[in-house]
C-alpha cells in the first residue's frame, strides 16, 4: 500500500490510483498548500559533510564564547526534491529577496522572542555547486543565503551551537505563490503532467527520490517568511558555510592603545640613545 503526505488518511494500492487522485484533487491540494506556511519536517534528514570554513576541533566552553558571531548559512537550495515532494526551481526566491532588506533568522521555526537568533539577517541568492555544499551530485543550485550576526545576549544557546559547528541543517519558512503538479505517467489523461515531469526531471539532483515517488510539485515562486536553524530539515542540502568571530570594540581599542604605547617607548629609547 502507498501512503503520501497529500492524503494522510488514505492508502493506495497502485501508483496509478495515487496519480488519479492527485489529478482529481489538484485544485484542492494547491489551495491547501498555499494556505499554510511550509516548515521543515524530519523525514528527509541526510548526512552532509561539515563544510564550514571555521570548523572547530573541540567544543568551546561557555565561558570562552565570543559576545557575537557572524554566520553565513544556506537556508534552502533549488533543484533538490524535498520530503514535501516539492522541487524548488531557479528564480523561486528572487522576488522575495528583492522585496525585503532583512529577514528573521529563527531557532527551529519558533516565532517567539526566546527563539529569535536575529531579526536582521541579510538574504541573497548564490549559484553554487553541489560539491560546495558537501554533496556528490553534479551540477549547480541556487542557494538562499542568510548572513547573520548572533548576539550572545539575545540567543546565547544558538551562538554556542554555531560557534561549535553543530548547526548542519537549515529550513525556510515559506508561503507558496506559484506551483504546478508533475507526474511520471504514460496515461493519456496525465499527458499535461508528464510533459511537466519530462521538462524538470533532468534538473533534479536527487533523482532516486523522484523515481521512487513518481510525482513532484514544481514551485517557481515562494515568499520567505523566515529561515531557521533545525536539527533535521526537509531539504538536507542546507549547511552552515561560515562562522567567525568579529573583534570587539574594546579589543580594537586595546590594540590601538598597545600600538601607541609601543611607539612612545621607541621614542623614549631614541632619546636615551641620543644622549650618548
Regions found by a protein language model. Give the residues of each.
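Signature of dsDNA virion morphogenesis modules
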Residues: 1-247
Amino acid at each position: 500500500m502507498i501512503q503520501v503526505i497529500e492524503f494522510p488518511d488514505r492508502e493506495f494500492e497502485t501508483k496509478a490510483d495515487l496519480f488519479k487522485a492527485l489529478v482529481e484533487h489538484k485544485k484542492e491540494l494547491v489551495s491547501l498548500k498555499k494556505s499554510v506556511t511550509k516548515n521543515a519536517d524530519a523525514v528527509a534528514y541526510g548526512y552532509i559533510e561539515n563544510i564550514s570554513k571555521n570548523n572547530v576541533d573541540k567544543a568551546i566552553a561557555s565561558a570562552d564564547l565570543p559576545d557575537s558571531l557572524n554566520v553565513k548559512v544556506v537556508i534552502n537550495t533549488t533543484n533538490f526534491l524535498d520530503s514535501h515532494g516539492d522541487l524548488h526551481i531557479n528564480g523561486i526566491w528572487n522576488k522575495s529577496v528583492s522585496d525585503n532588506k532583512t529577514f528573521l533568522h529563527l531557532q527551529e521555526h519558533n516565532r517567539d522572542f526566546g527563539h529569535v537568533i536575529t531579526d536582521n539577517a541579510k538574504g541573497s541568492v548564490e549559484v553554487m555547486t553541489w560539491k560546495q555544499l558537501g554533496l556528490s551530485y553534479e551540477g549547480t543550485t541556487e542557494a538562499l543565503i542568510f548572513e547573520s550576526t548572533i548576539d550572545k545576549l539575545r540567543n546565547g544557546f544558538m551562538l554556542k551551537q554555531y560557534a561549535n559547528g553543530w548547526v548542519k541543517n537549515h529550513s525556510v519558512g515559506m508561503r507558496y505563490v506559484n506551483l504546478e503538479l508533475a507526474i511520471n505517467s504514460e496515461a493519456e489523461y496525465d499527458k499535461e503532467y508528464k510533459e511537466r515531469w519530462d521538462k524538470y526531471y533532468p534538473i533534479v539532483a536527487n533523482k532516486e527520490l523522484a523515481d521512487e515517488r513518481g510525482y513532484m510539485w514544481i514551485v517557481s515562486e515562494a515568499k520567505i517568511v523566515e529561515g531557521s536553524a533545525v536539527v533535521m530539515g526537509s531539504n538536507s542540502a542546507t549547511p552552515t558555510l561560515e562562522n567567525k568571530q568579529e573583534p570587539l570594540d574594546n579589543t580594537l581599542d586595546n590594540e590601538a592603545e598597545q600600538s601607541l604605547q609601543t611607539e612612545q617607548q621607541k621614542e623614549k629609547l631614541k632619546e636615551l640613545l641620543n644622549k650618548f
